């Protein structure tokens, strides 16, 4: 997938919209996948992107977050955290599967299928230029922002 043009996709988005990848041609885009709204790690991850949102915008880059949660859950999470970017609902896991982020994980001693925390950077031509899988939140957003500034 890396260094290849992404296939277009569309998902329901907060703000009563539909996100279509093709509508963002001409802008760089960070797509971050996270397991679940309002959980500690996902909240910290979203807050980190929120706090760096202006810097990403100054670098010509938009941000979207994707999980399997409902739009209703996303709207609440977005409002509570003050996110200036949209959250996309992939309840059917179509885009999660396109990016290969669905993994078996250990939760409290048992195997469950869920989203592996991952971030992808798409350039203004729709080409996947960067990917981080199994993300640890501390320092991650700064690393992604530094990369975005190089493309």
Q: What residue spans do the PLM features occupy?
A:
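Chalcogenol-based redox active-site neighborhoods
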Residues: 1-151
């Amino acid at each position: 997938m890396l260094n290849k043009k992404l296939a277009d996709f569309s998902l329901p988005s907060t703000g009563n919209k539909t996100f279509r990848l093709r509508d963002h041609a001409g802008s760089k885009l960070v797509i971050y996948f996270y397991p679940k709204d309002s959980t500690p790690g996902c909240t910290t991850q979203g807050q980190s992107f929120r706090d760096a949102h202006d810097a990403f915008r100054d670098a010509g880059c938009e941000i979207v977050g994707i999980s399997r949660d409902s739009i209703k859950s996303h709207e609440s999470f977005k409002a509570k955290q003050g996110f200036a970017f949209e959250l996309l609902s992939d309840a059917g896991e179509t885009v999660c599967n396109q990016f290969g982020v669905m993994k078996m994980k250990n939760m409290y001693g048992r195997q469950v299928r869920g989203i592996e925390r991952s971030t992808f950077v798409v350039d203004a031509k729709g080409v996947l230029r960067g990917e981080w899988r199994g993300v640890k939140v501390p320092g991650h957003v700064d690393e992604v922002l530094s990369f975005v500034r190089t493309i």
